[in-house]
Amino acid sequence: MSLIYISTGGYFDQNGIKSFDYLKNNKIKLVELSGGKYFKNFKKYLPKLKDNCQIHNYFPPSKNSFVLNLASKDPIISKKSFNLVKNNILYSKKINSKYYSFHAGFRVDPKPKELGKKFKIKKILSKTEAEEIFLKRLIKLNKLAKKNNIKLLIENNVINKKNLKSFQTNPLLLTTPNEILNFFKKLQYYKLDIGLLLDVAHLKVSSKTMGFNLQKAHKDLNKIITAYHLSDNDGLTDSNKKFSINSWFWKNLKKKVKFFTIEVYKTDYVGYLNLIKILKSKL
């Protein structure tokens, strides 16, 4: 059976290690480290994290926060993003994790507080240029990942109506099924063994914004899905709400994947244990 992780992403007001301890002390076996508050000396915690967790996207948080963007043209953000991913590949090896996942790139550089909200109008790269930058960095990072037996996973972005209206174009990469599939063909052309981490909640909001069929999109993407992020929402905002036994994504769920991460916010360990139970009943 696929592994089931719980994300620390919803615990905004404490650091990831405290969230890890809380979950582990309350019957949660596997934890995905994501977000949270800044803390010093992540390396000293690596031994206690061994065999119990994996790292996702922007973690450990930097003292001066930024948005991880592997398609950025900004020299400072580019360097910070590349180094964060590079370090996380090495950290993943040290904690015996087989995977490291991160978001697809952006055509703009949003501020951390803008994530999930309306971005302020900024200089925007062409889709072609942003994809080329993203791809070049993936080629370099994949070499390091392969050397350390880590498989990289790209998570689909979420586009809401506010940002589409503001920019009059989609400022994010990999939000629609066609774009995701076409980009993964390029990865295959360059022989990059990189998988898709499908965030079903992101797909739901993007479907409503961009007007594509949600169930068909999920079905079409099945062939490249390696793992899932699970939560639910109203289709307008990526709110990380609880899913239920009747949630939309069960219909075309790919059951044989490497792992599922429950990325639900504002719940306690009892809520997570119930969500694990629902997920297991569907597998």
Show where each model-derived region lies:
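Short, hinge-like loop/turn segments at secondary-structure boundaries
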Residues: L49-K50, A71-D74, K118-F119, P171-L172, ...
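Active-site acidic/histidine proton-transfer and metal-coordination neighborhood
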Residues: D74-G195, V205
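Active-site-proximal loop/turn and secondary-structure-junction residues that shape catalytic pockets
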Residues: G10-F12, G35-F39, N57-P61, A104-V108, ...
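A short acidic, helix-capping loop that chelates divalent metal ions and anchors anionic groups
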Residues: K63-A71, K161-K165, L236-D238
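N-terminal pre-domain/capping segments
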Residues: M1-K94
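Conserved beta-strand positions in the central sheet of alpha/beta enzyme cores
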Residues: L30-S34, Q54, S101, L153, ...
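Histidine-acidic metal/acid-base catalytic patches
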Residues: M1-I4, G16-S19, N88-Y91, N96-K98, ...
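Short amphipathic alpha-helical segments
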Residues: K44-Y45, S166, T209-M210
